[in-house]
Design a protein with these regions (language model features):
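N-terminal amphipathic alpha-helix/helix-capping segment at the start of soluble metabolic enzymes
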Residues: 1-20, 162-170, 187, 194, ...
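Conserved anion-binding
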Residues: 2, 68-72, 77-153, 161, ...
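Short, acidic/polar
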Residues: 12-24, 67-75, 134-146, 191-198
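Structural motif
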Residues: 26, 52, 79, 150, ...
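Glycine-rich phosphate-binding active-site loops on the catalytic face of alpha/beta enzymes
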Residues: 79-92, 189-222
C-alpha cells in the first residue's frame, strides 16, 4: 500500500469543509473527519464527501464495551468509509468485535486501526495521570501488538514510534501518524512531533496533517509540499 497524506479537516460545519476543499480543483485528497464535524453534521457529511470522490478516514476513536462497538461499526461500515479507528486501550476483545462489526457480508471492510497513545500525551502525563509506569515507546509497542493480535490493519501513533512498531508487528502493519509539522511551523498542542520528511524516514505509512495545511495561506501549496516531502 502506497504512502499518502491525509488532511485533518477539523472544521465545525459542512460549509467550512466544502469551502476549504473547493480549492483542490485538480486533486481529491484523502481526508480525515473527526468528532467535531461528524457530531455536527452526522453521516450526511461522509456521504457528501464520498460522492465528491474523497477517501475518508473517520476518526471517532471508539472505546466502549465490545458489543456496543461491534454494532456501531456495522453502522459506520455502511457509510463506505475507507478507514476508521478504535482505542487500543479497549482490549483485544473490543478490537476483535470492532473488526467483526466492520466486515460486510461480502467480506470487504474499511481499514481498521487503533489509537495507541495520543500525540498530546507525554511521558509525564502517562506516568502521573494515567498511572502507567512504563516508557512511552514500550506502552505504544504493547498496544500495537494487541491490535495486531486482534487482526487490525495498523495503529495511530507518533512518527517517532513507527520504526519500533514495524519491528514488533512487521512492515505490513500500518502506522498512521499525526503530530506532523513543517520545520518552520508551530508545534501547537502536539508533544511528539516530526516533519513530513522525518516521518518518511521513520517509516510512517500515512501522515495526518491538519493546521499546517488547513490554516496555511495557500492550503493547496502546503498540501503539495507535504506530498513532495513525504511521498516524493
Amino acid at each position: 500500500m502506497g504512502k499518502d497524506v491525509i488532511i485533518a479537516c477539523d472544521f465545525a460545519e459542512k460549509t467550512e469543509v466544502l469551502d476549504f476543499l473547493s480549492a483542490f480543483t485538480d486533486r481529491k485528497p484523502f481526508i480525515k473527519i473527526g468528532m467535531e464535524l461528524f457530531y455536527a453534521e452526522g453521516a450526511d457529511i461522509v456521504r457528501e464527501l464520498k460522492r465528491r470522490g474523497h477517501k475518508i478516514f473517520l476518526d471517532l476513536k471508539l472505546h466502549d464495551i465490545p458489543n456496543t462497538v461491534k454494532k456501531t461499526m456495522r453502522v459506520l461500515s455502511a457509510l463506505d468509509i475507507d478507514m476508521c479507528n478504535v482505542h487500543a486501550g479497549g482490549t483485544i476483545a473490543m478490537m476483535q468485535a470492532a473488526k467483526e462489526g466492520l466486515t460486510r457480508e461480502d467480506g470487504t471492510r474499511p481499514l481498521l486501526i487503533a489509537v495507541t497513545q495520543l500525540t498530546s500525551t507525554d511521558s509525564n502525563s502517562l506516568k502521573k495521570e494515567l498511572l502507567i509506569d512504563k516508557p512511552m515507546d514500550e506502552v505504544v509497542a504493547c498496544y500495537a501488538k494487541n491490535a495486531e493480535i486482534a487482526g487490525l490493519d495498523g495503529v495511530v501513533c507518533s512518527p517517532l514510534e513507527s520504526g519500533k512498531i514495524h519491528a514488533v508487528c512487521g512492515n505490513g502493519f500500518l502506522t498512521v501518524t499525526p503530530g506532523v509539522r513543517f520545520a518552520d511551523g508551530a508545534v501547537g498542542d502536539q508533544k511528539r512531533v516530526a516533519t513530513p520528511a522525518d516521518a518518511k524516514a521513520l517509516g510512517s505509512d500515512y501522515i495526518v496533517v491538519g493546521r499546517p495545511i488547513t490554516a496555511a495561506a495557500d492550503p493547496v501549496v502546503a498540501y503539495e509540499r507535504c506530498l513532495n516531502d513525504f511521498v516524493g
